A protein has these predicted regions:
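C-terminal auxiliary extensions adjacent to catalytic cores
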Residues: 1-148
């Protein structure tokens, strides 16, 4: 049951993250739609948000508690089976999915920050500098591939 609860909690974290990503690309926060300078010509961060939304839905599907499932096994010697291994397998996938959702939020957040002409704290700026060495702002549609 602990793994079921952890999966549900992580699923909720992913869902909240995707909603923040949606808020960034919605055009309602003083940022351009899809976080791209020319949203009519470029789709910007629309597809990463679609991806996050799809992963959130998969997490919801994976979060049906495994602990509610049991079947008699071992020729009737075990009348209640915890299905702990199945819960662990599903939890592992939810962890991977949530990592991807959070990475998509980070991608969108750094893109959004680039549209603001404001400086953050030295600590945040140092993190952004490291991140921007790896990924800079996308001004036009570009292929995004993260090797894991």
């Amino acid at each position: 049951m602990a793994m079921d609860y952890l999966a549900i909690g992580l699923s909720e974290l992913g869902s909240i993250s995707e909603r923040r990503t949606y808020q960034l690309i919605s055009g309602l926060r003083g940022l351009p739609e899809f976080l791209v300078a020319d949203p009519g010509l470029n789709s910007g961060m629309m597809i990463p948000q679609y991806t996050a939304a799809s992963i959130v839905s998969q997490n919801k599907q994976l979060c049906t508690p495994t602990s509610v499932d049991s079947i008699v096994s071992s020729n009737g010697q075990e009348d209640h089976v915890s299905m702990g291994a199945n819960a662990a397998t599903k939890l592992y996938k939810v962890v991977e999915n949530t990592e991807r959702i959070l990475a998509i939020e980070l991608l969108n957040a750094t893109q959004a920050i680039a549209f603001r002409n404001a400086k953050s704290s030295d600590f945040i700026e140092s993190i952004l500098d490291i991140y921007r060495d790896w990924w800079d702002m996308a001004n036009i549609d570009t292929f995004i591939c993260f090797i894991h």
